[in-house]
């Protein structure tokens, strides 16, 4: 296992609890004589920290590992910036859900010590890359760890579009939108729209229509290396939007083409050795526990 010496810290702004956890984490890492680098936005709200700082974009070039303190949204943003550097990412949960940031604040020192001592698991999570083209020219690009979503924006009208997979026409749809999700994103917006849960190790993409105006519109799971094209109808009078992880947004025009495919670089997500995906689902999604309260 890799030995981590240069540790970056990213923290969600606007939370007293996050700042408290970042301070604890900083003290813990310094006590282990590690080199700590703060992402510049969190460094600004920690006066007198005395540490090296870096932009998020450059953090992956100077760190062996990056620890994100916040919720899943914080880790999504970090993942898009860090995946291209192949730097491992560890999450400490200070959000409401914690599918990706799975270390609780009360176990920070114990779990981080295990990871730093070489006792951890690594999952490679792939991202999607999306490109919006108008008259053959790219007008917007974005990456997503969870999902790429076509939606009406501020309009309440349905969107008409065609779907192509690997150059083959699949169908036309009239719906509130379309969600294209990774296995990581299958437990996010896609799940709320009726999509299936996909194990993170699957090399697959799920396409989930949002309230389609048909009884036969259903999610479809395709190979993870597929290239998906969504063509917005030229007859549309509204300008829908494309959102990547709900954080980056692009406005489309009638006739635009949205291309979605797997990004070459992957996120290296670190978990403690006792991480159990099904336990996470059971806890976060309210699945039933063992019958009778026991048994192996």
UniProtKB/Swiss-Prot annotation:
List the residue ranges forming a coiled coil, or say none. Answer: none
Q: Which cofactor does it need?
A: a divalent metal cation
Under InterPro entries, the record lists:
ATP-NAD_kinase_N, ATP-NAD_kinase_PpnK-typ_C, NAD/diacylglycerol_kinase_sf, NADK
Residues annotated as catalytic: 72
- In short, the EC number is 2.7.1.23
Q: Which GO terms describe its molecular function?
A: ATP binding; metal ion binding; NAD binding; NAD+ kinase activity
Q: Which GO terms describe its cellular component?
A: cytoplasm
- Pfam families for this protein: NAD_kinase, NAD_kinase_C
Task: Could you list this entry's UniProt keywords, alphabetically sorted.
Answer: ATP-binding, Cytoplasm, Kinase, NAD, NADP, Nucleotide-binding, Transferase
Carries keyword NAD? Answer: yes
Gene Ontology terms describing biological process:
NAD metabolic process; NADP biosynthetic process
Q: Which reaction does it catalyse?
A: NAD(+) + ATP = ADP + NADP(+) + H(+)
UniProt main location, coarse: cytoplasm
Where does this one sit in the cell? Cytoplasm
HAMAP family from the entry?
NAD_kinase
Task of the protein: Involved in the regulation of the intracellular balance of NAD and NADP, and is a key enzyme in the biosynthesis of NADP. Catalyzes specifically the phosphorylation on 2'-hydroxyl of the adenosine moiety of NAD to yield NADP.
Family membership: Belongs to the NAD kinase family.
Protein name, entry field: NAD kinase
Species in which this protein is naturally found:
Pseudomonas syringae pv. syringae (strain B728a)
This protein's gene is called nadK
């Amino acid at each position: 296992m890799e030995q981590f010496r240069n540790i970056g810290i990213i923290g969600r702004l606007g939370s007293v609890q996050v700042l408290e956890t970042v301070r604890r984490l900083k003290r813990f890492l310094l006590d282990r004589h590690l080199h700590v680098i703060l992402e510049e936005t969190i460094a600004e709200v920690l006066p007198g920290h005395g540490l090296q700082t870096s932009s998020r974009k450059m953090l992956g070039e100077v760190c062996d590992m990056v620890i994100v303190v916040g919720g899943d949204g914080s880790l999504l943003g970090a993942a898009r910036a860090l995946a291209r550097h192949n730097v491992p990412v560890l999450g400490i949960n200070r959000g409401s859900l914690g599918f990706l940031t799975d270390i609780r604040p009360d176990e920070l020192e114990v779990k981080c010590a295990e990871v730093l001592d070489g006792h951890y698991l690594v999952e490679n999570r792939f991202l999607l890359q999306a490109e919006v083209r108008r008259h053959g020219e790219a007008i917007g690009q974005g990456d997503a760890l969870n999902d790429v979503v076509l939606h009406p924006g501020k309009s309440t009208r349905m969107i008409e579009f065609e779907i192509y997979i690997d150059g083959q026409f699949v169908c036309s749809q009239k719906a509130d939108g379309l969600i294209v999700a990774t296995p990581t994103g299958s437990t996010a917006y896609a799940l709320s729209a009726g999509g299936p849960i996909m194990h993170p190790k699957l090399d697959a993409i799920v396409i989930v229509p949002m309230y389609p105006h048909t009884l036969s519109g259903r999610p479809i799971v395709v190979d993870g290396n597929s290239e998906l094209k969504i063509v917005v109808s030229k007859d549309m009078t509204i300008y829908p939007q494309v959102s990547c992880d709900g954080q980056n947004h692009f406005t489309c025009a009638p006739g635009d083409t949205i291309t979605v495919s797997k990004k070459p670089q992957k996120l290296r997500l670190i978990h403690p050795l006792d991480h159990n995906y099904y336990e996470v689902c059971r806890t976060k999604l309210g699945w039933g526990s063992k019958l009778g309260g026991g048994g192996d």
